Design a protein with these regions (language model features):
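Positively charged n-region of N-terminal signal peptides that target proteins for export
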Residues: 1-4, 21
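Residue-level detector of intrinsically disordered/flexible regions characterized by low predicted structural confidence
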Residues: 4-5, 421
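Bacterial N-terminal signal peptides
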Residues: 7-16
Length: 579
């Protein structure tokens, strides 16, 4: 009997491997790299979009925008109901304790991450990022406990990082051997997070940032320009054959770092800037590799949607979508994004009988089937043209010491977004071992206390007829500073006359003061003055959420005047419900 089971299991394993290999052939061979910056990019405007020959789940959605927009039923109500989520932006780059983009920056001599890497691991020609992966061990990571904490803080969904620009998959990946099950923690971290979300009835999405890995990683193909190691190549140049007898034998570094593309104009120069993508264009001498890269990109996402059933997916970028030939999509043009979306929506139809997921495409124009997102800042006015999520990290996207943890900054960030008809996802920094700092825990608990009192003004809400009122600076309403949440936001001063609005699911109007009024201070809501024309009926009731007593108020030509109770014990933002 055991022999029969073994044979069956072996057959299934071989079948699974052969299926994966048939969908994604081996990485094609490439010619030796030419001199840095010696090759012009192909013209992306004249390059016709390639249609990938990948099978997708049967259904009405086809891998083109026309079909997706025609068949998508609209953004699900659950996103508006949820409003606030936590981003689990965690992976091996936390090991460097150098903030965001540690993997790329450790290969830049003038960067703090390079200095930190030298102290912790050694020189990147000898001990590179691949070796960081091997030793990374987040042994204190407890997705169950963290999901419970995040839910207590008021979050109603999680955004879970599947793969960052470092190209290392945090699940049991079919198409990327450099993953958390094979190398490093030996854990399917995505499965652990998904199980925790199911346990606590939380929605969750998976984020994918590997679209521009191929030009992002070009620093790994360089070398020091000065010192004892000047001219000694970093480990990006290594091949499968170089691994013989080493710990990474059998793992091709090209599957992690990609290939040397510095021959194209601007690629090397842009790799050493703080951010900028290369010049728009096509890697025209590497079209076979580009096609393979795009297929692998798509198949990895489809692997997750098939086996982990996320409530939404997220792709990073700065333009209309991945593989557009410009911005972060520089290098190739193809319908990889449309292929992934069509497969995902058809799969939901097949599994559930309906579609209630969505696809986040960063900075895409209003498109039925896509949700927009952007980092840090807020629009100047209400934006109801398309559903959107505003994202930001507390401290940074990956851990570093000495972050400022301030509940008021998180709360005001949430208010600024929802008053503009948006949603929120905030990253909580996690130490390399997967734990979070005590000050961070206290911050989350304080946010949760505020949400317990004021959640009815947040969940399911929409923007009111006007964004808010208060001090005007350079012709615009004063708002919380953008950027990563830290000392700047914690020190920023509002007063009780800085006001934001939302409308609740039952039609109630909510007035948020961006600072707690002083005892018996008169707060005047000028937007409710008769000449503004915003109110369609008389005010019958004013309640202060979290306060059991009555509130003194009157309606005048100046607007709604409210006296803040002297015995109210509230923090950060007082919220009045108007009916």
């Amino acid at each position: 009997m055991n022999k029969i089971v073994t044979i069956l299991l072996c057959g299934l394993l071989v079948s699974g491997i052969s299926t994966a290999q048939s969908l994604l052939p081996p990485m094609p061979s490439v010619a030796p790299a030419k001199n840095v910056g010696s090759v012009e990019m192909g013209n992306s405007d004249k390059f016709e979009e390639v249609q990938l020959d990948l099978p997708i789940t049967d259904g009405p959605f086809k891998p083109n925008w026309q079909s997706i927009e025609a068949n998508y039923p609209g953004t699900p109500q659950w996103l508006r109901d949820a409003k606030f989520g936590i981003w689990v932006h965690f992976g091996p780059q936390a090991a460097g304790e150098s903030g965001d983009w540690y993997a790329r920056n450790l290969y830049k001599e003038d960067n703090n991450a390079y200095a930190n890497h030298l102290k912790r691991y050694g020189h990147p020609s000898e001990v590179g990022y691949k070796d960081v992966l091997r030793t990374w061990n987040p042994d204190k990571l407890d997705p169950d406990a963290l999901t419970k904490l995040y839910q207590k803080a008021g979050a109603r969904f999680l955004m879970i990082q599947g793969v960052h620009h470092d190209n290392y998959d945090l699940w049991n990946s079919k198409y990327q051997p450099w993953n958390s099950v094979n190398i490093g923690p030996k854990r399917d971290m995505l499965r652990e997070w998904a199980d925790a979300c199911h346990k606590y009835n939380m929605r969750y999405g998976v984020t994918f940032h590997h679209e521009y890995t191929w030009w992002w990683w070009q620093t790994a193909f360089g070398s020091d320009k000065q010192g004892d190691k000047a001219g000694v190549p970093y480990d990006g140049h290594l091949t499968l054959a170089d691994g013989k007898g080493k710990w990474w034998e059998g793992y091709d570094p090209r599957m992690l770092y990609g290939i040397d593309l510095r021959e194209y104009e601007s690629v090397d120069a842009m790799a050493h800037t703080g951010w900028s993508p290369p010049k728009a264009g096509i890697f025209s001498h590497h079209l076979e590799y580009a096609n393979w890269f795009a297929k692998q990109w798509a198949l990895r996402i489809m692997d997750v949607t098939e086996n982990y059933s996320p409530d939404f997916i997220y792709t990073d970028g700065t333009v209309e979508g991945p593989f557009t030939g410009n911005g972060t999509g520089t290098g190739y043009k193809c319908n990889a994004m449309q292929t992934v979306m069509a497969d995902y929506y058809n799969r939901q139809l097949k599994q559930k009988g309906f579609v209630d997921g969505f696809s986040i495409i960063k900075f895409r124009h209003p498109t039925n089937g896509a949700v927009n997102t952007a980092e840090f800042d807020f629009p100047d006015t209400i934006n109801s043209i398309q559903p959107w999520i505003r994202e930001a990290p507390v401290g940074d996207w990956f851990y570093a010491p000495n972050f400022t943890y301030h509940a008021g900054s998180m709360i005001r960030f949430i208010i600024e977004a929802i008053a503009r008809d948006g949603n929120v996802a905030l990253n909580i920094p996690m130490r390399p071992d997967g734990s979070i700092e005590e000050a961070c825990v206290r911050m989350l608990e304080d946010v949760g206390k505020w949400m317990d009192i004021n959640g009815e003004a947040v969940y399911g809400s929409k923007a009111w007829k006007t964004l808010g009122e208060g001090e005007i600076i350079n012709g615009k309403l004063k708002k919380l500073p953008g950027g990563k949440l830290g000392g700047g936001q914690a020190r920023f001063k509002f007063d009780a006359q800085d006001i934001r609005f939302t409308e609740g699911k039952d039609g109630s109007l909510y007035v948020f003061t961006m600072e707690i009024p002083s005892a018996e201070q008169k707060v005047v809501v000028k937007s409710m003055a008769k000449d503004k024309g915003y109110l369609s009926s008389e005010i019958k009731e004013v309640r202060l959420l979290g306060y059991n007593g009555n509130v003194s108020w009157k309606y005048t030509n100046e607007g709604l005047e409210i006296i803040y109770p002297k015995d109210a014990q509230l923090c950060t933002s007082a919220v009045f419900r108007i009916r």
